[in-house]
Amino acid sequence: MIYQLHEFHKTVMAPAVVWADTTRHFFTNPLSPLAYTPVSRTISANSEMFVRLLRRYPKPEWGIDEVISNGERVTVTREIAIDKPFCQLLHFRKSLDVAQPKLLIVAPLSGHYATLLRDTVRTALVDHDVWITDWADAKMVPLAAGPFHLDDYVDYICEFIRALSPQLNVMSVCQPTVPVLGAVSLMASQNDPAVPKAMIMMGGPIDTRRNPTSVNDFAAGRPHSWFSDRVIMRVPGNYPGFMRKVYPGFLQHASFLAMNPDRHMNAHRQFYNHLIRGDGDSADAHRNFYDEYNAVLDMPAEYYLDTIKVVFQEFQLPKGNWSVRGSLVRPETIRKTALFTIEGELDDISGNGQTEAAQTLARNIPAEKRKHLLAKGLGHYGIFSGRKFRETVYPQIRNFIRLMSQREADLKLVRMR
């Protein structure tokens, strides 16, 4: 019923949103006489605040049309490499003939769209041939497509890795560190020749017993039935996924805001002041950030509940009792894949040590194929986007991939001799 009420509220308020947006245009358009009245900025600012509070936020565009790569400006086209019911594997193809290391970026399925990693993709495209998982909004997936469990997520990752191998590097950001480690572990235990060359794991909940955050405490402090009873809802009839059980994006968005309410209130207060002062650049920066932040998707209920149980309540991966399709996940079987774990010193979602735990679990990876980075002064989002990511974190990722490629090439030369 809550989902239906949410949709009813959005629908009822839609005319008011249109009216407020029209008012904003009248008082900001340079061709309108109303834009030059003493109260124009105040009226337009209040109108925009109203619109942004009540409007729907669609999935943002990628907006990556060109990059500088190999010293030249090249165009970028986005192609669907693999189309699955719950995910599209996207390839950012560059008009460049030079072969570059292949990089699969596994985006989180945790409420936001994969476009949250736009800066990650744009930065990586300079030196790599990039693919990314673009997870579907569950309310848009027909019920006939069936359920989607955490095991299905792992299956998807295995399929994508096999499709892009050999010589593939995999980067997982936050939530997918667990299923990616699970996928690579299963492939390694089966002696699958398609195992990736390197894994880069960033800010993920491998072992949430280490330095638990408020997010971890919230998940661990309630019985599993609390989540299935309180936050799982059926999709309303105005979406293709009608009757599918989901964890709604608007609930996840509310939890995001509740983590740092003062920060978000201050950001919106400053945005209002920017509008009043006519500070267009600062206002645009706010719009760009919150257009992305406010765009959320629904998660399949099965996957969400599996993740709560496996990752946050029973700690099955670090305890060594996580099974996927009846096969035990054994990270100690990984030997050929290099591992680079990255954490943010100020991360308030995945605490320090939670991602580094992968180094302990995958204990048979040779020392020369390991690296860990604690990024000083960076929070959760700072380790994969922003200026400091581009200047301090990404160069180490690029160099790690290059080093592993060079060592593999050197080893092949030695064997040939």
Question: PLM features: what roles do these ranges have?
Answer:
Residues F312-P331:
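Active-site nucleophile elbow and catalytic-triad environment of alpha/beta-hydrolase enzymes
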Residues E61-I68, E72-V141:
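Short, surface-exposed "cap/lid" segments of acyl-processing enzymes
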Residues M171-T177, G344:
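Conserved alpha/beta-hydrolase "nucleophile elbow" surrounding the catalytic nucleophile
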Residues M1-A45, S165-P166, A183-E302:
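Alpha/beta-hydrolase-fold enzymes
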Residues I334-R335, F340-E343, D347:
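Short beta-strand/loop motif that positions the catalytic acidic residue
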